[in-house]
Amino acid sequence: MNRYELLKSLKGILNEKLVICNIGLPSQELYKIDDQPNYFYMLGSMGLSSSIGLGLSIAQEKQVISIDGDGSVLMNMNTLTTIGNRAPVNYTLLIIDNGSYGSTGDQNTFTKENTSLKKVAIGAGCKKVIECYGENTADNLKKAFNDKEHSYVIISKIKPGNISVDPIPLNPILIRERFR
């Protein structure tokens, strides 16, 4: 399963949630699959989807899911310590781990080698951390959304690879305005 197939499998699950999606191809793929006004597409801030989603979950009570990539999380690992110590129960971080920087040419990340994002998240204080293959991601997200006592970090292991998608035809101001 690649990232596009994974995002497609989540189509019905995300509709009632506030979704913050990682820059580049993940946002473009999600837009192509099922554009919704409750989806906030990151257009140029690698590594910040998890931070923005965390802030949003603290500021209000709706369920928030940040969709981030392994490369972005590695770039902003300090956010895992904040998630581990401050994330409210309405927050879920989905890390799509394809072992590569998919939006910049599929260069390998260190999750292809010795770095375990599950161990990093647990070490950062995250209490509910699930690592699964892409096919099991939807079920694990449902579990997280139904748990009213914990925030979750879900690491979905998938194959690298990109599909050809058009850029998102929305400017940042329009994305923000319709997300409100």
Where are these regions (language model features)?
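Glycine-rich beta-alpha junction loops
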Residues: I23-S27, N98-S100, K157-N162
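Short acidic, glycine/serine/threonine-rich loops at helix termini
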Residues: Y31-I33, G105-N108, S164-P169
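Long, charge-dense
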Residues: I96-Q107
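Glycine/aspartate-rich loop-and-adjacent alpha/beta segment that forms the canonical ThDP
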Residues: Q36, D147-R180
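Generic beta-sheet signal
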Residues: K17-V19, K62-S66, Y91, K148-S156
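Active-site diphosphate/adenylate-binding microenvironment
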Residues: M1-M46
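Conserved thiamine diphosphate
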Residues: N108-K143
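Thiamine diphosphate
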Residues: E29-D97
